[in-house]
Amino acid sequence: MLEQIRGPADLQHLSQSALSELAGEIRQFLIHKVAATGGHLGPNLGVVELTLALHRVFDSPHDPLIFDTGHQAYVHKMLTGRSHEFDSLRKKDGLSGYPSRSESEHDWVESSHASAALSYADGLAKAFELTGHRNRHVVAVVGDGALTGGMCWEALNNIAAARRPVVIVVNDNGRSYAPTIGGFADHLAALRLQPGYERVLEEGRKAVRGLPVIGEFCYQCMHSVKAGIKDALSPQVMFTDLGLKYVGPIDGHDEHAVESALRHARGFNAPVIVHVVTRKGMGYAPAENDEAEQMHACGVIDVATGRATKVAAPGWTSSFSEALIDYGAKRRDIVAITAAMPGPTGLSAFRDRFPDRFFDVGIAEQHAMTSAAGLAMGGLHPVVAIYSTFLNRAFDQLMMDVALHKLPVTLVLDRSGVTGPDGASHNGMWDLSVLGIVPGMRVAAPRDGARLREELGEALDVNDAPTAIRFPKGDVGEDIPAVRRHRGVDVLAEPADGLSDDVLLVAVGPFASMALTVAERLRKQGIGVTVVDPRWVLPVPEVLTEFAAAHKLVVTVEDNGLHGGIGSSVSAALRHAEVDVPCRDVGLPQQFFDHASRGEVLADVGVTDRNISRQITGWVAALGATPADADEVSERLD
């Protein structure tokens, strides 16, 4: 049956039994396809019936469907003609793991960061009103923890202020990555269905207000009494007191019930909340039984067991997790904060070991940062573990609430640099540029697991400024020993006997391994290279200017955007120190990258050992540091 669905129109003629059969097919399709490619399995298994109902009730793309935390949009993609592309999910030139405007007219926003959908919906509804398109509904699907983010409530406050047709579907599965926390999560759990409430209220309003002379006065009196009773007995007043209609809660796995609720909501032509209760991982036992994350996201897995087909090598996240626990055992002032991601950021083990020193604040990065400031003011040392891409959301709080007060807060930025398959929204290629403008900020970029542990310890010893440790997604690899350490900077390689000090190659973090390969390739061409790892990359260590002065060319290699990155900072430091040595930088161009593997993205932008070797050869030849012709040497490098 799924093969016959080319678009939402193909759903309209289906009976309830056919819809139930189709839902089963969709789940089996998702399980087998995502098992082969990796992706967000649990969230999509939970929204099958909901997505079917949405496309039967609303006319997409005439009525925009906006999925908050867009990893819930796989079923939406299937129902809008993209089922045949799922073998390429999250692969280069393949199907995106999130809504994508370039894929389909049914995808309105490239949504993947949480809590933004309601603001998009508010803006679209206003635009439709101003341009005379009053017959268009805007539907925002929120949930998977998104309502723990403050941006949702800012949007709700605005949406409720006008009578525009915005339908807000709360997909209440009680979770984001981990179980959703906080007062709002408790509030949703308390809600109960009140059949006929809105119909009776509307009929009563018309009848009482229709009374001559005293009608409006009587209505206001009755409304006040009703509001008082409702406040005492009915927990959905959080929504209704904002001026939002409320429908629910509805069994999110009963397609007929969800469809009926959505049709009811559509008829209001006003802002309305439809509360749908779903189960993350529905229909797949390994996901339902995964109490930690209900298979929120997975790699390639065995369908029968739900287990990964390959044993994962030690990763950066687990290395951080182990180190933090060790430091936490020695120091009771160390506390940890996550924004709804204890597992992905490596804090689950710390939570289990030190539950009273662990705080999950929900999807609320701004609050996390300022709460950390308060903890630091109280004499503790907070460690805020967060994906690099989500740091952008808390920049003002970092600047004004933490750095301005010179507070000892340590940021641990996971998934820094190019992450790959999750695409533009999840690459952490801005953090060095952002952190570089924060006064007093100190940033470390460990090259391996040993340095991660070491630099984390050094960060925890800082008591007069914020610090950050950044590392990428993936395997941590083997430790890379230093030849020597000079004033805090590790020297990883020096020119071989007989070669001059031609190039100082400054490697940022894990790019140290690539830099060593580049140095060896250049050595074979008679170019002497010194490879250094600054360890603490911001502010630029003063000793780097001394290293630079002893070489003919400085080259920086970093997993960050070139604008405002370490290359820019090193160049500025050389100018300030009046060291007149040319400086070239290798990094990421200032653009958004489509989804692909990390290696594919880096290759596309020329950040490979071969290409860097060719570039440096040309630069050295242009400086006259070697008599070899640049083109000739480049050919030999190939």
UniProtKB/Swiss-Prot annotation:
Cited InterPro entries: Dxylulose-5-P_synthase, THDP-binding, Transketo_C/PFOR_II, Transketolase-like_Pyr-bd, Transketolase_BS, Transketolase_C, Transketolase_CS
Cofactors (names): Mg(2+); thiamine diphosphate
Catalysis: reaction(s): D-glyceraldehyde 3-phosphate + pyruvate + H(+) = 1-deoxy-D-xylulose 5-phosphate + CO2
Enzyme Commission number(s) of this protein: 2.2.1.7
Keywords, in A-Z order: Isoprene biosynthesis, Magnesium, Metal-binding, Thiamine biosynthesis, Thiamine pyrophosphate, Transferase
Pfam families given in the database record: DXP_synthase_N, Transket_pyr, Transketolase_C
UniProt binding sites for Mg(2+): D144, N173
One GO MF term attached to the UniProt entry: magnesium ion binding
Name the UniProt record assigns to this protein: 1-deoxy-D-xylulose-5-phosphate synthase
The organism of origin for this protein: Mycobacterium sp. (strain KMS)
